[in-house]
Amino acid sequence: MDFQISAQQREMVASVRSLAQTEFKPNAMRWMDGTFPWENMKKLADLGVLGMSVPEEYGGLGLPILDTALILEEIAKVDYVTAMAVLGEAGVQTRVIARYAPASIRERILPQVVSGDCILAVCMTEPHAGTDVANYRTNARIVGDRVILKGTKTLISRAPEAGMFVVFTRVDGKPGREGIGCVLLEAGTPGFAVTGTYHTMGGENLHEIQFDDCELPLENLVIREDGFRKLLTAFNTQRCLNPSISLGLAEGAFDEAVNYVRERTIFNKPISDFQGIRWKLADMFKDIEAARGLLYRACLTANPFPDPFMAAAAKIFCN
C-alpha cells in the first residue's frame, strides 16, 4: 500500500499548517470555556477546508478521506477545539447529506457548509442507550407527506451553533436495528430545543436536545430502509477522522516534549542528554508512527467508505 503523500496533499497541508501555527496556536486557550471558534472557522472556510467532504458540484473540494485526515491532524496539533469543529463539517453528517439527501436539500445546504454559514451536528447518542442504536427510543412517525419526530438526544456537539441536524432515529416505531433511519432537521423547527449543556475537559460543550413532535417534510427522511447498515457504513468515515485528531494531539504533545527537554537543564546540561528521557521520547515517537501507519492504511481503504475492520483498529489504537 502506497503511503506517499502527493505534492498536492503537501501543499494543502502546508497552507493549513501555516494558518494553524501562526494564528490558531497562540489563541488556542480562548476556546477552552466552550466558546465556538467562529473566527477560526471563517479562516478555514476561506481556505476551502470546510468543504473538504463536499462534492465539487456543490462548491466543495471533494477530497479523499486521507486528505481530510491529514488536515485535521495538522489543526489538532495546536488547537483541539477547532479540529473538532472542523470534524463536524467533514465527518459523517456531511457525507450522509451528500449521499442520501434529495437534490433540493443538497443544493441548498452543502454550499453553506463550504462557506461556513451552516454548521452541522450529528445526533446519535440517547440518554438511556448511548450509541446502542437497537435501543433507540427517538421515533420518526410518517403521517401522509410529513414526518413527526419525537425523542431526546444527548452529548451532541455544536447544538446551539448548528443550522442542520442529522438525526438517526427509529422510523414508525419499528423495533430493532431494522427500524433505524435518518432525518434532517433544521434549527428553528417548532418543537426543537436545546435543553442541557455539559462542559468537557477538552474545551467543547456538549448538549442535550429535545424533539417534541417536530413536523418535517417527508423528503427530510433521507434514510428509511436498511438504515442501520447505512449508518455504520457511513460512520466508518468518522472512525478514521476522529483518530486523526488524536494523532495530531499526540504529535503536538511530542513536539512540546522535545522542545522542553532541550531547554530544561539539570547539573548544567539539558535533560535530553539523559538516557531515561531519550527512552521516553523514543517510545512516544514509536507509538505515533505506528498509529500513523494504521490510520493512513485505514483511510486508503475507502471506496467510498473505509473498511470497517481497519477503521475500528485505527480508532482503537489512535484513541
Residue spans for each PLM region:
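Active-site-adjacent elements of ketosynthase-type condensing enzymes
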Residues: 128-136
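Alpha-helical interface subdomain recognition
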Residues: 1-79, 88, 100-105, 112-117, ...
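Flexible, glycine-rich active-site loops centered on histidine and acidic residues
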Residues: 94-100, 122, 134
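Flexible, small-/acidic-enriched active-site or ligand-binding loops
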Residues: 135-137, 188-221
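A short, Trp-centered hydrophobic/proline-enriched beta-strand micro-motif
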Residues: 116-124
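A short core secondary-structure module
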Residues: 146-193
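Short Ser/Thr-interspersed hydrophobic loop/turn segments at strand-loop and sheet-helix junctions
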Residues: 48, 72-76, 169, 185-189, ...
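Glycine-rich phosphate/pyrophosphate-binding beta-alpha loops
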Residues: 129, 154-159, 200-201, 238-241
